[in-house]
């Protein structure tokens, strides 16, 4: 197993780098990695995963970097350390921007050279002087912009030091990436933050008017942190020993960015442009010729990336939790395994009520066949969860397991909390149990599902807040929606005392901000299954994409059918 050490792992790009590894089950092109994250700040993700080690250290202290590399012996170092902030903040606190970066960059480069470790060095758009387009080879012909004067010199000197080691010692085990204006979910949203982060905070804090600096006419090349992380991995994987810009290929005005965020927020806000404040550089646009040559182009659209960033911040300020009420089906009275018999409710009326709530809905005639596992149930427990690779976990367990020693797997603990005597043995190993549920077996349970339905149903993809998913389904569930909550649920069946463990994601078509502010209660027993205020209405969707029915007798009956 290889090891990667990420400095600056609590920063915007550093967090995406960690999550990229976790999302790929610690793999990069089939190669397993152990991840070591180091920073002088706490990490921004709220779990500690198996295979991930975090050390909170002051990287500016003597011998800290040397000791870390000696301790972990990494195959790859990604230097994502950087200090982000507005041009005003950089001018007012130049030492805070220049000294830490300069010292850390110098030490990391020297230690990676001495150990012959591959280094990905994250530079910055700030190294360039103002011009119509930023070309890699033009950096050393001019001086940096005065708006990035101090931060840019630390990055420039890091690049120059790598070139020096290459010339004098032949050290060429490095890549330099120069991202454009980076933004994303794990940015700093306080005072003095970068333009997108500060605009999001203003929008969320206001109900009528926001004030933005300048006149809105300057243009920027914005890139999403997740795309930057993907490019970093590609540069290492392909051993690109070069300095490469990473831009979007788009030129976006500040005004357009603000307008997009207001639209996504669902708010009706006035914008005051304060022309007494500086515009900053009028244009920042990366030349992406070399980037295209290496096929390192972004994959996430600007608007989708804004939406994900906005959703992260709105979830953060509401304590990362939407107020979902536990739902019940106590009055439905369905018979287990019956296709046609429904007691206690008019069939048509009831199906109309649940049409937008039951996942994998192909035809109404097929509902009853599945309702024994989906409808006459009560949610007993519910936990937010993450799926990465083949593992699923409650956050609490991984927080308690800082060294990656989980102890019991989550379902072993979970079944002790519920009714472990009724859980079949196969659940002791989730992956093995899932392999036993072949496509043919799933088809027996859900006979009208087609191939694409089942492929979506049995995947292990991590869906996060703000992700957009386009399931390959027909009917109500067809289309594009935004995930706002994913949870693990245990249900018991009132008819036979059995139950199931399943995973759902909740998503909406509409703007994310009103959903976070307004969505309040799910109650399937009322006439209107969604209780919320405008504009959410009935745009709620639920998809079950991992489902374990563990009533052994009933699953055997299904097998016999």
Please report, for each region that a protein language model flagged, where it lies by residue.
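C-terminal substrate-binding subdomain of Rossmann-fold SDR/epimerase-dehydratase oxidoreductases
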Residues: 205-318
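Catalytic core of Fe(II)/2-oxoglutarate
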Residues: 467, 477-480, 489-561
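Flexible, glycine-rich beta-alpha linker
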Residues: 128-129, 149-150, 177-196, 219
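N-terminal Rossmann NAD(P)H-binding glycine-rich loop of SDR-like oxidoreductase domains
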Residues: 2-26
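Conserved Rossmann-fold NAD(P)-dependent oxidoreductase catalytic core, especially the SDR/UDP-sugar
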Residues: 106-148, 175
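NAD(P)H-binding glycine-rich loop region in Rossmannoid oxidoreductase-like domains
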Residues: 59-100
